[in-house]
Amino acid sequence: IAEPSSGLRSAATAVACGQIVADGPLADRIEQIVSTGHATLARPVLRQLARTDVPIIHIGDRSTFPAVAGPNVKFVPAVTAAGRGDENWLRSWIESGDRFASALLAAEPLTVARAVWDAAADGLLVVGSSNPIRDLNLVAPVRLTGPQVLANRGLAGIDGTVSTAIGAALTFWGRSIALMGDLTFLHGANGLLIGPAEPRPDLTIVVLNDDGGG
């Protein structure tokens, strides 16, 4: 299960709509969890990481683990696979996620998030907090090469997203797109003030009408 900004959604084992699958019957059969990075987006994933009834191995330290770490949580610098796992187990997760993904693509405004992801293609995609990043978490495709994704941590903070996108675009070699909600855009609109001697980025900003966030 990989968040949009993790850089791992293109992995061959990535699960679409993983947060939905992790809240279903397959989750009851989990025997061990391995996590890396700092998961923050989906409550079902956070609930899995807060479990005390299965061993959890986190690649990293406590600063990147999003739950209270009980005695079942082990922090390690790296892991090595002991061998190939049960391919039927992986297939059941992938097929379940793909079914959810197909159903969700017909829903607005999720189609907007998917269209922006596709438009970014091999470029840079900067994503604002609240609904946009969560929409992408549902509909951004997996097991396919996608854009480089940047998203500010915290997800409750929206100030400075426009400036973040401009700064990132200025350092990127290709086209850049930013997707953000209406309130996020308003809170960062002063970042659009670019002086006459300052460089201008190749940046498209897409503002999602999400009624001030969700």
What name fits each language-model region?
Residues 44-49, 115-116, 138-139, 191-195:
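A short acidic, amphipathic alpha-helical/loop segment
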Residues 140-214:
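Thiamine diphosphate
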Residues 2-3, 36, 59, 126-130, ...:
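Generic beta-strand/beta-sheet core signal
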Residues 90-172:
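Active-site diphosphate/adenylate-binding microenvironment
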Residues 1-11, 123, 133-140, 202, ...:
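Redox- and metal-dependent alpha/beta enzyme cores, enriched for Fe-S-associated oxidoreductases
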Residues 32, 124, 175-177:
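Structural motif
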Residues 2-100, 195, 209-211:
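Glycine-rich, acidic loop regions that bind phosphate or pyrophosphate groups
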Residues 1, 38-41, 129-134, 156-157, ...:
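Gly/Ser/Thr-rich loops at beta-strand to alpha-helix junctions
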